Amino acid sequence: RDMALKNTYKVTVGVIGTGNFGTALANLLAEKCHRVLLYARSKQKALQLNKTRKNGYHNIADNVKIITDVSFLADKCNLIFPIVPSINFREMMKNLSPYLKPYHVLIHGTKGFDFNKSNKSSNPLKESIIQIFTMSEVIRQESSVVRIGCIAGPNLSKEIASKMPAASVIASEFDE
């Protein structure tokens, strides 16, 4: 098989997050996948992106569909790339989790940590305990997903969009 052919794989892949990196990744996946569903939280943003087919300096590939229904995304995509800021990651996982099954594969591209404050003491004068979690740990805590990975740079979405050489690492405990 010639791996350079467009739309080589007849699968639908999901990307959560319409920021620069989420859009760049959706376009990159669109080169090899039949269809990419790009999830936007805002219906207004989704309408605008579907109409203009442009997000900042990114032109959006024809086979990328911008959606606002997270249950539809989980139903249609076994492979999902959550690409949202770390401050919103746990909330996003809580919204997505009811629709996920153990067979889903999540490869997050979120930099940073989840800082979870909990005040376990009944004494309000005592400081809160801060727990620090990776995004992979948040996925495990908030969902039934078993296969989890992480995609990381060094890469810049503008370089990816411009088809410049870029490097990424995908790490996981699983071989897929």
Give residue spans per PLM region.
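Rossmann-like NAD(P)(H) cofactor-binding subdomain of soluble oxidoreductases
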Residues: 67, 72, 79-165
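Structural beta-sheet core signal
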Residues: 15, 38, 106-108, 150, ...
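Conserved anion/nucleotide-ligand pocket segment
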Residues: 160-176
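Conserved residues at beta->alpha junctions
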Residues: 40, 83-84, 172
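NAD(P)+-binding Rossmann beta1-loop-alpha1 motif at the extreme N-terminus of oxidoreductases
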Residues: 4-68, 95, 99
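Short loop segments at secondary-structure junctions
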Residues: 43, 143, 172-175
